[in-house]
């Protein structure tokens, strides 16, 4: 089964054809900056199961960090579409709100970087929570 998504203005479109390897909320400060304050609700999709079908996103990578992530976004409307992280090679971290059907994959299965969680962030009942990423000190 395939799922489609796009940026807000529709200039950049994509398709996913692989099942997610994770379904999460990320509460790290970096994601809060990108989202405007909310946790990042995301899916980890194998790279081979993701492709852009229209448009070409712009990429941003902070130069002042060691091993920074790459963030891909629409140059027209600014919608953040996905992240590529050195710590997760072969995976694109897709922003669920950009899917045509954001509810297609149900509730997140885990919440990560809860050490940065804000008092107004909500983690659904029963979701596994980690102060950092699973397996990281």
What are these regions (language model features)?
Residues 1-137:
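A short Gly-Trp-Pro
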């Amino acid at each position: 089964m395939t799922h489609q998504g796009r940026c807000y203005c529709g200039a950049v479109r994509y398709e996913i054809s692989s099942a997610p390897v994770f379904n999460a909320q990320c509460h790290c400060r970096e994601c809060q900056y990108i989202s405007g304050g909310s946790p990042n609700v995301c899916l980890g999709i194998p790279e081979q199961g993701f492709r852009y079908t229209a448009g070409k996103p712009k990429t941003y990578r902070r130069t002042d960090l060691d091993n920074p992530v790459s963030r891909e976004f629409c140059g027209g409307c600014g919608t953040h579409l996905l992240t590529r992280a050195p710590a997760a090679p072969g995976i694109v971290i897709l922003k669920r709100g950009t899917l045509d059907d954001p509810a297609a994959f149900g509730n997140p299965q885990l919440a990560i970087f809860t050490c940065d969680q804000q008092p107004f962030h909500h983690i659904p009942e029963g979701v596994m929570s980690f102060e950092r990423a699973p397996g990281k000190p």
